[in-house]
Amino acid sequence: MYPEELCKPMREELTSSGFQELTTVEQVNKLFTNKDKTFLIFINSVCGCAAGSARPGVILSTQNAKRPDLFTTVFAGQDKEATQKAREYMTPYPPSSPSIALFKNGEIVHFIERHEIEGNLKHVIADNLIKAYNQHC
């Protein structure tokens, strides 16, 4: 587990852009009671591809006219139980961080794995998400 003072700016980068942080299993489970909404879960990470591509890309995607009703995040390696619970809802995709999941009516409809983030620019990540928003939101 990384020191919170290291992770705090990585959390705030998302929360200052309107993301709701999910730090408990209860918060994750409550999110899935929103059966009539679309929502995104970003699995945050301290790795370089989270900082260079994933966080900037997912934040950029929030500017699209069509977008999920809720933007949420869990922090892998920090909020372990919440992250594990979120990953259970992301089956059949293997655990990966960072990763991004879009849900509609409680069902996963789009997923971006770490290997799709690594080496890509933030605009590529944002465009990938925007296409999914335009289709599902």
What are these regions (language model features)?
Residues 51-64:
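Typically the conserved alpha-helix immediately C-terminal to a functionally engaged Cys/Sec
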Residues 83-97:
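Short acidic (Asp/Glu) patches
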Residues 29, 47-48:
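Short, catalytically relevant binding-site loops at active-site mouths
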Residues 43, 66-85:
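Thiol-based oxidoreductase modules, predominantly thioredoxin-like and allied folds used
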Residues 94-137:
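Non-catalytic, surface beta->alpha helical segment in thiol-disulfide oxidoreductase systems
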Residues 1-36, 133, 137:
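N-terminal leader/targeting and pre-domain segments
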Residues 35-47:
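Short active-site neighborhood of thiol/selenol oxidoreductases, capturing the structured segment around
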